[in-house]
Every structure is written in C-alpha cells, then in structure tokens.
Amino acid sequence: MNQVEIYTDGACKGNPGPGGWGVLLRSGPTEKALFGGALGTTNNRMELMAVIEALSALQRPCAVTLYLDSEYVRKGITEWIHGWKAKGWRTAARQPVKNVDLWQRLDALVSTGGHRIEWRWVKGHSGDPGNERADALANRGVDQALGRGALASAE
C-alpha cells in the first residue's frame, strides 16, 4: 500500500466570503499541489473541501497520514459523524448538521476509498512547513475565487 502524506488547509476572507482550499500531497520524492476556491463560502466548508479534494486525488488505496489544522474536520470525521449518521444527520441538539453535503461526500470517500487514514492535527500558523504550504495554496484558491484565475488548479 502506497504511503502518502497529505497537508490540507482552508481559508476564507470574511466568514462567509470568498474562500479557498489548498492541498499538498507527498509520496516519496513526489509532490503534488492542488488548490481551488469559491465565492460566498465559509472557512469550515473550505477546510472540508481541502480534505475531499485530497482524498479524491488518490488513484488507489493508500496508507495516508493527513495533517490538518481544523479540529472541526478532524473531530467531525473521527468522533461526531457516527452520532450524526445514527440521528439522521442531526446533532445531539437535534439540529441539522451544518455542511451535511460535504460531510456526506467525505464520509463516502473515507468509507469506500480503501484508504487507511491517520488524522493528525497540527497547530495552524505555527511554522509547520507542510501546513504553511497548504495555507499558501488555500490563499491562492481565494485569489482565484476573486477572479484572478481559474477556479481549480493543480501543479
């Protein structure tokens, strides 16, 4: 099983506002950077999109170490999602889960992708090189959403 390190980040200028997501994938000496953006979005939606786009980019089952600075996404996918699904995508307070469309996409990728994923939280803006790269890519996604380029790119 291929080993892959993934760093993801989301950014939003205003919340809601124009936002972007960034992904850095590493497998051995190979790196791939992805980014994209949207208007009228939130930071949490962009954090989720980064992880969705990262896992969607994997072409075969992998052993993934996924680094993210969003406790919302990490706890959501490792802890909260089980209760949400059992309650028909409602929270413990019986409210509809926010961003349910993205949570369902992420759940499908995690459940059916065949990946072994280790979710690792890193403190944002703390100097972690992979997280800093993902942050810079997310900000490029914001720029694209604001009309300074295409809406999704890979390099």
Curated annotation (Swiss-Prot):
GO terms for molecular function: magnesium ion binding; nucleic acid binding; RNA-DNA hybrid ribonuclease activity. It is an enzyme of class 3 (hydrolase). Its main location: cytoplasm. Endonuclease that specifically degrades the RNA of RNA-DNA hybrids. The keyword Magnesium applies. It catalyses: Endonucleolytic cleavage to 5'-phosphomonoester. Mg(2+) 1 binds at D9, E47, D69. One of its GO terms (cellular component) is cytoplasm. Residues 1-143 form the RNase H type-1 domain. GO terms for biological process: DNA replication, removal of RNA primer. PANTHER family: RIBONUCLEASE H1. This is Ribonuclease H. Its EC number is 3.1.26.4. It is found in: Cytoplasm. The keyword Magnesium applies. Its cofactor is Mg(2+). Pfam families: RNase_H. Mg(2+) 2 binds at D9, D135. Keywords: Cytoplasm, Endonuclease, Hydrolase, Magnesium, Metal-binding, Nuclease. Monomer. Belongs to the RNase H family. InterPro entries: RNase_H (IPR050092), RNaseH-like_sf (IPR012337), RNaseH_domain (IPR002156), RNaseH_sf (IPR036397), RNaseHI (IPR022892). CDD domains: RNase_HI_prokaryote_like (cd09278). Binds 1 Mg(2+) ion per subunit. May bind a second metal ion at a regulatory site, or after substrate binding.
